[in-house]
Amino acid sequence: IYDIEFNKVFEGKLGTGLLDMKKALEGINSPALRVTNYVLTDNDDDIFSIGDEFTLGVELFNYLNSVSDLQIEITSLSENVQIVDGIWNVGSIPTSSQKENFDTPFKLMVTSAEEFDQEVIVKLKAYSLPNNYVFEHFFSINVNPSYVNINVNNVKTTVSKNGLFGYTDYFQTNGLGFRLDTLGSMLYEGGLLIGHNSDSKIQVADRVRNGELFDRDFWEKDVISRQDIKGDEAFYAFGSFTDTSANQDEIGLVVEQRVLAYNKIGHENYVILEYEVENFSDKDLTGVAIGLFADWDVTDPSLNKGATAYGKRLGYVYSLGEEGVVARIQALSANVFNTYMIDNVDGGYGGVDIFDEEGFTTHDKYTALT
């Protein structure tokens, strides 16, 4: 099958060609290995940048006949990742049994990257000479990513290159969500919104949902990356983005974003997002409002309630019947403070209705901001 010219780039990934029923029945006497779990980590923020060493731990399950003298080797199909330790002498795996190497995983290193969010393919090959058996599996690894993971205190979250937090896009392609300790993510979507009302025209620049799918107003200028700490923080990152590629909602902004997190006692349960906004358009902006949109899912989303503590300048969401777990956003600046809780029901209980035909429109977003 791989002798065909246009199949060569897919070598090892297309199966074995035409269905051979006789061979399929004979294969019942063969082992049948599958990767049932794996862990990629650098034991830090799991952002694999140039020069970083990371590990790959694999769990294998054998569904059919026992396999003996099993050897496993991983190889990188890209010159951007080097295999530091890629051999695992497994031995035998009986029928309906599993083995893993999480305590002694494979070791890899990122040696180079030509671009951000570069995909690297690592091939795992398992073979047994006594069983005349070979199994291959391919791992896709994102190196030099265009986002940062914050993982230095009880909060685990991700900040993107273009104004989102929790995940890097609406589809949750990459990201930790927003987790507290060992709890699952409490956030479905989160991002920065900047709006203004000038000359009877309302504009809001953002990257969150809209009536079609999501807005694409912010684009990276300097891709966010982790930096050396400047004070007593445990994590610091910096990046910038603009709205110059927006269509109807281009305002003319450059936004510098900073991310800080601390692990000192009493400061383990929050992350700081700081935005410095510059107007480089040729006009003064009036009615400017800046805020964070967050679709919280605390424990049971169907029981979520929202409230505001004006004295503390924060809005928060909690789940009825659950104690202790509360998601909060607090404004740290001295600017005018405002919160808006959107009712997650058809009609919006008379407020902003994100379920109508137009969805979460620019006017809805500006209403929520102001």
Which role does the model predict for each range below?
Residues 59-64, 76, 110, 277-281:
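Asparagine-centered strand-capping/turn motif at beta-strand->loop junctions
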Residues 82-114:
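Intrinsically disordered, low-complexity Pro/Gly/Ser/Thr-rich segments with frequent PxxP/GP/PP motifs
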Residues 198-274:
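Extended, loop-rich substrate-binding clefts of extracytoplasmic carbohydrate-active enzymes
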Residues 102-149:
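Terminal connector regions
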Residues 61-81, 86, 288-297:
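Short acidic, flexible loop segments centered on an aromatic residue
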Residues 141-226:
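Solvent-exposed N-terminal domain segments of exported/luminal and surface proteins
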Residues 286-370:
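Glycine-rich (often Gly-Gly/Gly-Pro-rich) flexible segments and glycine-rich loop motifs
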Residues 1-53:
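C-terminal subdomain of the subtilisin-like protease fold in secreted/lumenal serine endopeptidases
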